[in-house]
């Protein structure tokens, strides 16, 4: 899988970063033009009720390890559906440890400090690689702000340039 990931990233970089003159009719945009970045909830405010199995909470730790486990917090399964994460969802940790990944760890609730990244207009690979393209810049921004936990702000997404089809 790592080899496939590297090949896909190399193709993306070749066509969308290094050789943009070959794109044809494309225009400049920013990350928020191609995707919605939904911030998670403070899940401690939505605990699983007594006698409710609830859902595991997706936090930065779980994203980094690729799964929830028996030590993961649990939240109510009655949270708004947009905060319930399923396999195949792009998740972007924007605070603390910054990373972008496609979640494959099962159904869970989206915690604060994580964005659910989705688009009704563009394919998932397109949104994923543009977000990932800006990750090192976001890490530098967060490091410069690190008093307690370094983070980026929504305005950083709003100025991160992308190429989009005309």
Language-model segments: which ranges?
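Non-catalytic DNA-recognition/assembly elements of restriction-modification systems
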Residues: 1-42, 63-66, 163-166
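Sequence-specific dsDNA recognition surfaces
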Residues: 32-47, 54-87, 104-105, 109-110
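Short coil/turn segments at secondary-structure boundaries
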Residues: 27, 44-52, 141-144
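Basic, amphipathic alpha-helical recognition segments used for DNA target recognition
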Residues: 30-38, 64-66, 103-107, 112-164
